UniProtKB/Swiss-Prot annotation:
It holds the Pfam family YfbU. Belongs to the UPF0304 family. This is UPF0304 protein VC_1871. It comes from Vibrio cholerae serotype O1 (strain ATCC 39315 / El Tor Inaba N16961). InterPro entries: UPF0304_YfbU, YfbU_alpha-helical_sf, YfbU_helix-hairpin_sf. It comes from the Bacteria. NCBIfam families: PRK05445.1 (NF003936). Gene3D superfamilies: Helix hairpin bin, yfbu gene product, domain 2.
């Protein structure tokens, strides 16, 4: 991360203020302040993680994935009891993404749900949409199958199973 001395001074002051305002995370902010003040370039890369960029195409893909889960849940509600018994209800829960490898995606989902108020019916679970295992490849396969369904918001039990097993 390239920064002028003036930018480093401003960021250092921000970290100092944050350490005063948030005593629970004071050590974290003091550490970051030291890194910025002293210009430790190896460690300044950590700052890039906090200022990520999620392109519009990826944002739309995440929304499509969440919309697919919404459609699956609503379709499941419309099934009769006999058809619903053949659908694994646990697999209708949107788990989110892996914080270790898909952190930007987890944070975007949290933003959509918490800040934008979208998909309030999704259960955040204990891990707040951290699936604790990579999910993007699985969701992409599911999206392909879902998009091939003729009635995406009125899925049959068989279509639900095909999507989940993609």
């Amino acid at each position: 991360m390239e920064m002028t001395n003036a930018q480093r001074l401003i960021l250092s002051n921000q970290y100092f203020l944050m350490s005063q305002l948030d005593p629970n995370n004071a050590n974290k902010y003091k550490r970051l302040q030291t890194i910025v003040e002293r210009g430790y370039e190896l460690h300044m890369r950590e700052l890039n993680r906090e200022f990520g960029c999620l392109p519009e195409t990826e944002c739309r893909e995440i929304i499509d994935i969440m919309e697919m889960y919404h459609a699956m849940q609503e379709s499941n509600r419309m099934l009769d009891d006999a058809a619903r018994k053949d659908v694994d209800q646990r697999r209708l829960t949107f788990l989110g993404f892996d914080m270790a490898t898909e952190a930007q995606l987890v944070n975007y989902v949290r933003f959509l749900v918490d800040s934008e108020g979208l998909y309030p019916q999704f259960d955040k679970g204990e891990h707040h949409f951290n699936s604790q295992m990579p999910m993007l490849a699985k969701y992409r396969r599911m999206l392909t199958t879902w998009r091939n369904c003729p009635r995406q918001y009125h899925l049959s039990g068989n279509e639900l199973r095909q999507i989940m097993n993609a």
